[in-house]
Amino acid sequence: TNRSIFSVDDAMKFNLSGGDNAWDCTQYLNIWVCNLEGGTLGYATQPGDPADVDGVVIQYNALGRIGNLQSNFNKGRTATHEIAHWLGLKHIWGDTDCGDDHIFDTPQQYGYNNGCPSFPHLSTCSPNGNGDMFMNFMDYTNDACMNLFTNGQKLKMRALFALNGPRNSFLNSTACDSVTESGAALPTEVTPVV
C-alpha cells in the first residue's frame, strides 16, 4: 500500500484509495495487513459479502515475531478470530448482552471478556457450571488465553466448504500451485509501511 494508516472503511482493499485490490475470492482468502487507526485489531467480511471486499484485515503489529508488536495481541490470534468470522462464526456472546452465536455447544455469556480471566469466570448469563468460555478464539481475551474452537464452531466453519456452500470453490482452487504457474508476480522485497 502507499498509505501509512487506514480507517475501518475498506480503503486498504482498493488500489485507488492507496490499498491493494482483492484477488479472486473464489480462489483466495484475501488478507490485508496494515496500520489500522483507533485501536482496531482486525475485521472480516462474512460469507456472501461483495467480492471486491471479501477477506480479512489485520492490524500489522497484531502478528509476527519482530518489530513493535502489541504485547497482549502478538500470537496471531487476531488472524484466527477474523478468519473464523470470514468462515461464518459470530462472537461467542452473539454481539449482544447474553446473546446467541447460534452454536449449540458454546455457553451464553454477557459480553466479551478481556485480559486473561481465571476459570471459572461466571457472568449473569452463565452463573452456574463452567461460566464464560473466555478461552474461545471468538472472545476478546489476550492471545495467550485463547486456545479453542468448539466442535460446533468447527462444524459451522467446515459446512461452508460443503457442496453448494459459499466457500466450496476453495476445494478445487489452484491457488496453492506455484506462484509463477498461477501468473501472479511476487515483489522481491516486502516492507511494511509505518
Describe the function of each predicted region:
Residues 1-192:
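Extracellular (secreted or membrane-anchored) zinc-dependent metallopeptidases
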